[in-house]
């Protein structure tokens, strides 16, 4: 389906060999939870997509266009995951492209996986050996160049001792896990304080991360966005990872550092625990 500004593909199983997303990773994506037939945080995901469009200079699809086609892709599926991929378009091979190239906009519905953590399941996390290089121009947005994450996923697949995830570090600072942002919590005089790693020249500023920061601050909790070194982890009592598909997952251990899962944290954050 084509309108004047975008080629639109809904639940398409194939892609053109000339699509620049396939050839060069020239595009953006968002992965969104659909719960009880509601698209969760659609406006926030589109806002980040638009920011990415500004950075890599692709035309912005409007919120109304995305919402309309997202609902078609979801159909009558009550709970699922919606992936939106925005490619610069299809053209002959070569880095340069025609100025009038029409972007390709894909809407893909997939099933929700069952590997969700909760308060009772054990989640052990190790540190990734792979150290990504920074790119301040492309960090924070969901661009299609995911080779760093693929290499870290390969490392996780081959690691022993039953680890569930890997923490990515850069210059001794903790950034995030393979596909989630991190929060650390300290209890001082029965009051909780929260820290989350600064996202600078690597990593994603997640939609769920921002929602949790806003929620905690609205409830009166102090949340610091700061550099957290590996050596700082032992200072914290609790830790959890977050993303927009799985919500909050509490972590039992990172490396040798063990964490607790107090009931009060569950009560504070329960609206984000899926």
Task: Label the model's feature ranges.
Residues 1-64, 68-71, 87, 92, ...:
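Helix-start/capping segments and mature chain N-termini
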Residues 81-86:
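ATP-grasp fold ATP-binding core
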């Amino acid at each position: 389906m084509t309108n004047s500004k975008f080629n639109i593909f809904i639940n398409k199983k194939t892609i053109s060999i000339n699509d620049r997303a396939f050839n060069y990773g020239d595009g953006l994506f968002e992965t969104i939870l659909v719960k009880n037939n509601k698209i969760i945080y659609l406006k926030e995901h589109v806002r980040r997509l638009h920011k990415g469009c500004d950075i890599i200079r692709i035309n912005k699809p409007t919120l109304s266009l995305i919402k309309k086609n997202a609902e078609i892709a979801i159909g009558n599926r009550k709970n699922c995951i919606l992936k939106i991929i925005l490619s610069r378009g299809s053209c002959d091979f070569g880095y340069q492209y025609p100025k009038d190239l029409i972007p390709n906009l894909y809407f893909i519905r997939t099933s929700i996986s069952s590997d969700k953590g909760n308060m009772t399941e054990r989640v052990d996390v190790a540190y990734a050996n792979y150290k990504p290089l920074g790119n301040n121009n492309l960090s924070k947005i969901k661009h299609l160049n995911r080779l760093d994450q693929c290499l870290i996923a390969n490392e996780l697949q081959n690691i022993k001792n039953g680890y569930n995830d890997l923490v990515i570090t850069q210059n001794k600072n903790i950034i995030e896990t393979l596909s989630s942002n991190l929060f650390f919590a300290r209890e001082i005089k029965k009051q909780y304080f929260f820290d989350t790693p600064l996202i600078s020249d690597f990593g994603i500023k997640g939609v769920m991360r921002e929602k949790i920061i806003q929620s905690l601050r609205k409830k009166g909790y102090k949340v610091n966005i700061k550099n957290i070194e590996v050596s700082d982890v032992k200072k914290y009592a609790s830790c959890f990872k977050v993303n927009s598909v799985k919500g909050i997952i509490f972590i039992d251990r990172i490396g040798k550092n063990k964490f607790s899962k107090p009931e009060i944290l569950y009560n504070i954050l329960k609206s984000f625990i899926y």
